[in-house]
């Protein structure tokens, strides 16, 4: 078991670095999928098969594949992206250092609050699956954060739909109800044009 733990952990670290360092976005997404698969292996080692299946189905099967399709369909100029990155290299390094220092400080402050002298053991009932245990905790102790997360995702979904349904002034739209209500009385126009004037003064709907 420790061998598999170190194996999955090493593969996660290597694949995560490849996600960031890969110049091709398609390769980055493939490395991201590989990272999620190894994380699912860690979940299986911890006995959380439900979380492992969620990682595979949701992140690999939906999110990562969606990223892959979007990147493959977009016409991305990698040389131009690299040029822009080099122009803002100093700013990128500065922001990276700030985030790294923030992460180190957070880890140091978090480890100080851990009481290493206490030896607490948690009894896990054999008749309760990890799915039932996660559900009972999620809908009792963490019910409010869970509902807020769902509300945030719902607002994000509505915002995406609103942005895609934004009407443009120069785009012509079909009025289906008006088209279906046409008959020969309001479609066929009988007129007698004036000599040498053609149909200039005829008004169409």
Curated annotation (Swiss-Prot):
Keywords: Cell membrane, Membrane, NAD, Quinone, Translocase, Transmembrane, Transmembrane helix. It is a multi-pass membrane protein. It catalyses: a quinone + NADH + 5 H(+)(in) = a quinol + NAD(+) + 4 H(+)(out). GO terms for molecular function: NADH dehydrogenase (ubiquinone) activity; quinone binding. One of its GO terms (cellular component) is plasma membrane. InterPro entries: NADH_UbQ/plastoQ_OxRdtase_su6 (IPR001457), Nuo/plastoQ_OxRdtase_6_NuoJ (IPR042106). The keyword Transmembrane helix applies. It is found in: Cell membrane. Belongs to the complex I subunit 6 family. This is NADH-quinone oxidoreductase subunit J. It comes from Rickettsia typhi (strain ATCC VR-144 / Wilmington).
């Amino acid at each position: 078991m420790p061998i598999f733990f170190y194996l999955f952990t090493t593969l996660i670290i290597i694949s995560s670095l490849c996600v960031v360092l890969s110049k091709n976005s398609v390769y980055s997404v493939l490395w991201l999928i590989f990272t999620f698969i190894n994380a699912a292996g860690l979940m299986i080692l911890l006995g959380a098969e439900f979380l492992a299946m969620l990682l595979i189905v949701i992140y690999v099967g939906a999110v990562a594949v969606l990223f892959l399709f979007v990147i493959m369909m977009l016409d991305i100029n990698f040389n131009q992206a690299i040029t822009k990155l080099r122009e803002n290299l100093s700013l990128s390094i500065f922001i990276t250092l700030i985030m790294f220092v923030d992460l180190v400080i957070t880890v140091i402050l978090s480890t100080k609050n851990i009481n290493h002298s206490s030896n607490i053991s948690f009894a896990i009932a054999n008749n309760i699956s990890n799915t039932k245990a996660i559900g009972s905790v999620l809908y009792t102790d963490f019910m409010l954060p869970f509902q807020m997360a769902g509300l945030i995702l719902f607002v994000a979904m509505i915002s995406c739909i609103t942005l895609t349904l934004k009407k443009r002034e120069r785009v012509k739209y079909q009025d289906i109800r008006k088209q279906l209500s046409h008959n020969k009385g309001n479609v066929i126009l009988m007129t007698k044009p004036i000599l040498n004037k053609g149909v200039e003064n005829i008004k169409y709907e």
